Curated annotation (Swiss-Prot):
NCBIfam families: trpS. GO terms for cellular component: cytoplasm. Proteolytic cleavage generates 2 forms; T1-TrpRS and T2-TrpRS. It is an enzyme of class 6 (ligase). GO terms for biological process: angiogenesis; tryptophanyl-tRNA aminoacylation. Belongs to the class-I aminoacyl-tRNA synthetase family. PROSITE patterns: AA_TRNA_LIGASE_I, WHEP_TRS_1, WHEP_TRS_2. Pfam families: tRNA-synt_1b, WHEP-TRS. A motif ('KMSKS' region) lies at residues 353-357. This is Tryptophan--tRNA ligase, cytoplasmic. It comes from the Eukaryota.
Length: 475
């Protein structure tokens, strides 16, 4: 990777912010591979120059997790306040006017994260000795924070752990909900590390018109789907916030520490809270942040507070963890690292993500083979032409075709995926044929998941959700 060019050439504070983040990653990479001192010194000098330019432009010091303009509450939490041509992403709303979906390169700049480039993918392959997951090969996980730092630790035999989660708002999960768990399972397998899975039933109670009994019931049902992804009970702890907060003083102490060091003004700026929001919403971000710190799980880590955390999640969850990364050094903990995924689009198109609240926008894990076929044929947005003649002549548009997008997530064979892309783009393959390819992938995927889920008993769920020592030993 070459040095970032001079800060004065950046067209905006956002671009300058992104340049600093990229240069910071370069410095870390050079140090990790023990590059010559002159090369490291040159990169550090460039980084300091960029930070000076940023301070001159913004009137304040660069902060890694606070992109310029990101703390203004005027439009946060209100997608209607955003220009129709702009993408809008927060933990509750994803919207774009583009049929191609969110512009993820712009989002990297806006959020101040770093792109997962080929160099990083290759480094993961070298570190694990395993072929990169298709989600990495195809840019589905596209952005990160401090992944090089995690790899540095791993290569030096230092431990880390994984943290991901699920907000249980319905009894049935859809195929889009599988994305973080499929990838997290792969990460756990190749790195051989512990995993904690937060079931944020408290969040869903605060945000949705649901009872405590309903959200807790959804937690238990969703836990069965998560377990059915193949996680090892000896390496995985799944917990309900409603349960765990009351039985783990270490977890609650971290929640309180975070709450003390984050102001109401900060959470308003990050999450768009208003004066009419209940106080539970305002305090919830601290609960989602707490699993990022290892001493929140004394039964696993025996009180150690310095074990690095890696969080695979969709990028709409990043605001929670920007806040977490900002507060971590102030309470004496390492910043969590993150791997961000793209959104799984609704059947009707990539302008929004798949939603469990709209049955026609989603392929549920409870759907029958017939329901899957009907939904894909009837609702999946097509990039094909209006007539067969036009399609044969001009070809289809894979960039907007939902069936092709879904195949990029679930079809393992890279060569077959590329052949489908070529055939559809050239007009050799028709929309109906492309949809059949997707149906042939989704039907067995869902059926196999259903078969595994049937094997998950209430006793197995209880075992996964019981606080206990896992098969890792910490001093």
């Amino acid at each position: 990777m070459a040095d970032v060019t001079n800060g004065e050439r950046c067209a905006s504070p956002q671009e300058l912010f992104s340049s600093i983040a990229a240069q910071g990653e370069l410095v870390k990479s050079l140090k990790a591979r023990k590059a010559p001192k002159e090369e490291i010194d040159s990169a550090v000098k460039m980084l300091l120059s960029l930070k000076t330019s940023y301070k001159e432009a913004m009137g304040e010091d660069y902060k890694a997790d606070c992109p310029p303009g990101n703390s203004t509450p005027d439009s946060h939490g209100d997608p209607e306040a955003v220009d129709d041509k702009e993408d809008f992403v927060d933990p509750w709303t994803v919207r774009t006017s583009s049929a191609k979906g969110i512009d993820y390169d712009k989002l990297i700049v806006q959020f101040g994260s770093s792109k997962i480039d080929k160099e990083l993918v290759n480094r993961i392959e070298r570190a694990t000795g395993q072929r990169p997951h298709r989600f990495l090969r195809r840019g589905i996980f596209f952005s990160h924070r401090d992944m090089n730092q995690v790899l540095d630790a791993y290569e030096n035999k230092k431990p880390f752990y994984l943290y991901t989660g699920r907000g249980p708002s319905s009894e049935a999960m859809h195929v889009g909900h599988l994305i973080p768990f499929i990838f997290t399972k792969w990460l756990q397998d190749v790195f051989d590390v512990p995993l904690v899975v937060q079931m944020s039933d408290d969040e869903k109670y605060l945000w949705k018109d649901l009872t405590l009994e309903q959200v807790y019931g959804y937690t238990l049902e969703n836990a069965k789907d998560i377990i059915a992804c193949g996680f090892d009970v000896n390496k995985t702890f799944i917990f309900s916030d409603l349960d765990y907060m009351g039985m783990s003083p270490g977890f609650y102490k971290n929640v309180v520490k975070i709450q003390k060091h984050v102001t109401f003004n900060q959470v308003k700026g990050i999450f768009g809270f208003t004066d009419s929001d209940c106080i539970g919403k305002i305090s919830f971000p601290a609960i989602q942040a707490a699993p990022s710190f290892s001493n929140s799980f004394p039964q696993i880590f025996h009180g150690q507070a310095d074990i690095q955390c890696l969080i695979p999640c969709a990028i709409d969850q990043d605001p929670y963890f920007r806040m977490t990364r900002d507060v971590a050094p102030r309470i004496g903990y390492p910043k969590p690292a993150l791997l961000h995924s793209t959104f799984f689009p609704a059947l009707q198109g990539a302008q929004t993500k798949m939603s469990a609240s709209d049955p026609n926008s989603s392929i549920f894990l409870t759907d029958t083979a017939k329901q899957i076929k009907t939904k894909v044929n009837k609702h999946a947005f097509s990039g094909g032409r209006d007539t067969i003649e036009e399609h044969r002549q001009f070809g289809g548009n894979c960039d907007v075709d939902v069936s092709f997008m879904y195949l990029t997530f679930f079809l393992e064979d890279d060569d077959k995926l590329e052949q489908i892309r070529k055939d559809y783009s050239s007009g050799a393959m028709l929309t109906g044929e492309l949809k059949k390819e997707l149906i042939d992938v989704l039907q067995p995927l869902v059926a196999e998941h259903q078969a595994r889920r049937k094997e998950v008993t209430d006793e197995m769920v209880k075992e996964f959700m019981t606080p206990r020592q896992l098969c890792f030993h910490y001093q």
